[in-house]
Structure formats: C-alpha cells, structure tokens
UniProtKB/Swiss-Prot annotation:
The gene is hemH. Fe cation binds at residues 215, 296. Transmembrane segments: none annotated. Pfam families: Ferrochelatase. Belongs to the ferrochelatase family. It comes from Rhodopseudomonas palustris (strain TIE-1). PANTHER family: FERROCHELATASE, FERROCHELATASE, MITOCHONDRIAL. One of its GO terms (cellular component) is cytoplasm. This is Ferrochelatase. Catalyzes the ferrous insertion into protoporphyrin IX. One of its GO terms (molecular function) is metal ion binding. GO terms for biological process: heme biosynthetic process. HAMAP family: Ferrochelatase. It is found in: Cytoplasm.
C-alpha cells in the first residue's frame, strides 16, 4: 500500500486585488491657519527645501531661523487673513484644489478602479499622507499631476522629489507617472483666452492693456538651465497669437521676488507703477502660471499691486481670476490626465 506524504511548502499568496489607478493633483501649499504660528510652520518647511532655496548653507540657516522666521510669519499672516476662507477655515488654494479634484473625479465618470485625490507639496494634506492613502486603497499605479503649467525645479521637480522620497520607503511601490508641463497646450491656451475675454466683457471699463504676471525666480536658477522663463515666454506668445493682440498689449512680467538676489525681470510691481506714471489709466492683470487663486494672486496682485497702480495715477484695475475649478479649468486638467493615463484605463 502506497503512502502519500503531504509536502508542506510556503503558503500560496492570495490572488492580487483588482488594480486601481490613483490620480493625485498637487499644488504648492498653504498654512493650516492664518495666524503667525501656522504661517511660521509653513514657511519653515517651504524655505528649507533646497529646490526652493538652493544655498542651504550655514548663513542661510542662521538667517532663516534667526531673522526670517521671527519676522516674516507675522507679516504674511496678516496677508493671509485678508483672503482667508473663514467659512471653511482654510486658504482659498486649499478650497479650490479640493474642488478641482472633486470635479475632475466627476468628469471622469464612473470608473471604479480610478481614484482622484489631491495634496500639497508643503503643508496639508501632505504628499506623503495622500500617496500612502492611495496605496492603502489598492492603487498599484499612480499618476502625479503637478498643477504648474510651466516647469521649474522649484515647483514641479520638488513634487517629484517628494513623491519618490515617499515611494523609497514602500516595499510594494506603485508604478509612477508624472504629467509634463502644459505651458502651450492648446486646451490650456484656449481656456486662458476664453477666460480673459469673458472677464473683460463683464467689466464696465476697457483695459488699455493686459499684464501677464508669473511667479518670479532667481535669475541664477535660469542661468543654471531651468527652462521656466522660456516656458513662460512661450505661454504668452501663444496667448497673444490666440487672442490676436500685439506684444505691447499683453506684457510679460514676474512677481513675488524674495531676498536680495536678482530675480527674473521685468518685475510686476515696477512695471505696473511705470505704466501708471506713463499715463495708463485702465489695466488688467492675468496670472497664467497659477492654476488656482492663492495669496500671490488674491492679495499680492488684486490688492497690493492694485494699490500701487492707483497711487501712481491709475483709475481702473482688475485682476482676472485663475482658471480654478471652472468648467474650462477642470477640462484642461482632464485632458492632461486622460492623455497620460493611456494604457492604464
């Protein structure tokens, strides 16, 4: 009589769950509160990133911890308080980015294996938390969407840095894709042109010209090879062509300079002051590099620069809203996402 001896081997792993795909929208960041403490926490994280401030040597650390974080947070907190969404107790950037994710999810329809989420590079919800949450929900593939039309090492690249930093700690890593910049994508340019024309049509005055203001950057970063400036120029050139306006009717400037180094020029505030001094009385400003309204658009441009214009002779000023969670704005993101999800859906 033969005897069958059972062979005890390693347990067979269960079949993998159906693959899910995560889409993660990422914007720059925001403090959790508009008080000095909240802004200090945010600025510490932001200004400690070597992609933002490349020289993180002893002098910078002493300046950051000894001077900047003891003076700047109180001033910036007052600015945040001017534009804060008090109903939700959060910054407009957080409100809008959440809405962008929700509307994108709805526009993609009923796809049970597709999950749309959102995060901030600095502050909350953090990239780490949201990537870990998507993985916990079964996402084996992840599309990270930096919401910056123009690429910069200080924006898009640091999103990639942080995403891979999180993945480095995971044993079962999701496959990762990152959307490219979309600075002259036809859907983006069309949406900008339509938004500008629609806003101008709603005004009781006709601006003499439009200033296209982008976030600034140290000139040294461009000299090292960052393509940001060239992509900003390409956006404005495409927008001029799409709108049929002359170069001197749609100007390119750079805002939000910080510190003592030379930044990209011409500067927005100096340009707006000069225009008013030269006799321009009616002005519009659009911020094509911002996918959502934030401190730099709602306070710096719509309030500070409006005051500069009026103080030097201007009479009518308008800040054109960003694309935000408008139908056209969400459609830009949707087209970008669907293009990069090819082969995964």
């Amino acid at each position: 009589m033969s005897v069958i001896v059972p062979i005890h081997g390693p347990a067979i792993a269960p079949a993998p769950a159906p693959e899910r795909v995560g889409v993660l929208l990422v914007n720059l960041g925001t403090p959790d509160s508009c008080d000095t403490k909240g802004v200090r926490i945010y600025l510490r994280e932001f200004l400690s990133d070597p992609r933002v401030i490349e020289n993180q040597g002893l002098f910078w650390k002493l300046a950051l911890n000894g001077i900047i974080l003891n003076t700047r947070p109180a001033r910036k907190a007052k600015d945040y308080q001017k534009i804060w969404n008090h109903e939700k107790n959060e910054s407009p950037l957080k409100t809008i980015t959440r809405a962008q994710a929700e509307k994108l999810s709805a526009s993609l329809g009923d796809r049970g294996h597709l999950i749309v989420d959102w995060a901030m590079r600095y502050g909350n919800p953090s990239l780490r938390d949201r990537i870990e949450a998507l993985v916990a929900k079964g996402c084996s593939r992840l599309l990270v969407v930096p919401l910056y039309p123009q690429y910069s090492a200080a924006t898009s690249a640091t999103v990639c840095d942080q995403a891979f930093r999180v993945l480095r700690e995971l044993r079962a890593q999701p496959t990762l894709r990152v959307t490219p910049p979309y600075y002259r994508d036809s859907a983006y340019i069309d949406a900008l042109a339509t938004s500008i024309k629609s806003h101008l049509a709603s005004l009781t005055f006709e601006p003499e010209l439009i200033v296209a203001s982008f976030h600034g950057m140290p000139q040294a970063y461009i000299d090292k090879g960052d393509p940001y400036q060239a992509q900003c120029v390409a956006t404005v050139e495409a927008l001029r062509e799409r709108m049929g306006v002359a170069d001197d009717k749609l100007l390119l400037t750079f805002q939000s300079r910080f510190g003592f180094d030379q930044w990209l020029q011409p500067y927005t505030d100096k340009t707006i002051e000069a225009l008013a001094r030269k006799g321009v009385r009616k002005l519009a400003v659009v911020m094509p590099g911002f996918s959502a309204d934030c401190l730099e658009t709602l306070e710096e441009i719509a309030q500070e620069n409006a005051e500069i214009f009026m103080e030097h002779g201007g009479e009518e000023f308008t800040a054109i809203p960003c694309l935000n969670d408008s139908d056209a704005g969400v459609q830009v993101i949707r087209q970008l996402v669907l293009r990069e999800l090819q082969g995964w859906l």
